[in-house]
C-alpha cells in the first residue's frame, strides 16, 4: 500500500517536522514540482491563470469582488507554501501542518481564518488504494487548497463553478469549501464501499469450500490494510467535522448549512461502513481458519481410509512372509493367484463397508 507512484528516491525519511523551527520542509513522499493556479469567479466572470511560485506577493492577485481559489499542487517548494500561509495571516506552525502528511486530521478555526488538514483515500486504475495529504485554508473570499500531487482532485469542484451548480458563483467562499470537502468525502465513501464489496466477495468465496482458497489469507490481509487506511482518514475527520457546524466566523452561512449537514451524514455513512468492514474481516479470519481446519481434516480422513484398507493386507502379507518350513500355501500351484485374489477381495470389502457407513 503506497501513497502514490511519484515517490522521491530518498523518501524524505530524514524530515519529520516534529520540532519547533524557523523553517519547515515537505515531509512526504511525492516529488511533484509545486505549481500554483488561481481561479477567480463571481456572478459574471470566471477565469483561471498560473502564478509563479517565486512571486514577491500572492495577495496582490486577490480580487475583492470575486471568490479567489488558489490551487497549490505539489508541496516540494516549502518556501513558497510557507510564504503563502504567512501572507494570508497564518502562523509558521500552520505551514508545518500543511507540509507534514503524517499530521493528524484537524479543523482549526480562528477569528477570520479556518485551516482544514485531512487525508483523501481513493483507488487508482490498478485497484491500489492511495492516500493523499490535503489542506484547505479559507479566509474571507480567499480559498487556498494544498495537495501533494498534481492529480485533478478537485476537478468536479471546478466543473461545478463552470456550470454554476447550486448558484455557487453567487455565494460566498463557504459553498466552494463545501464542494471541495464533498469531493474528498465522496472519494472516502467510494473507497469504503469498494472495500466492503471486495470483502463480501471474499466471504462468498470462502463459504464455498470447493473454491481454490490458496491466497485468501494474503487477500484478507491486504483488504484489512486498505480498511485501516480508510478508517484512519475518516474517523478523525468525523470527530472534527462538528466544528464546522458550530463555526461563528461567517464562512458557513445559514443558507448553506444543510449542505454541511449532508456532508456530516456522508461521514457517518463512512464510519458505519468501516465498522461493517471490521466485523466482516473478523468473521473472514475465523472462516478462513475454519476452512483450513476442514481441509486438513479431509486430508487426514483420506489418509486414514487408505491406511485402514491396507491394514488387513499388511496382516496377510505378514503371515505369508514368515519363514516357517511347514506352510502348505507356498507349495500350492495357484497359491500366488489365490493370495492376490484374497487381498483384492479384502481391500474391496473394506472399501465397500466404509462406503456403506458413509465414512467418506
Regions found by a protein language model. Name each.
Residues 213, 220, 253, 260, ...:
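Short hydrophobic alpha-helix at the HAMP-DHp boundary and the N-terminal turn of the DHp
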Residues 1-246, 251-253, 262, 266-273, ...:
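Peripheral, non-transmembrane regulatory/ligand-interaction domains of membrane transport proteins
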Residues 242-257, 283-292:
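Long amphipathic alpha-helical coiled-coil segments
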Residues 153, 255, 259, 333-337:
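Short acidic-hydrophobic sequence patches enriched in Asp/Glu that either
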Residues 2, 7, 265-360:
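Hydrophobic alpha-helical transmembrane segments and their immediately adjacent juxtamembrane loops
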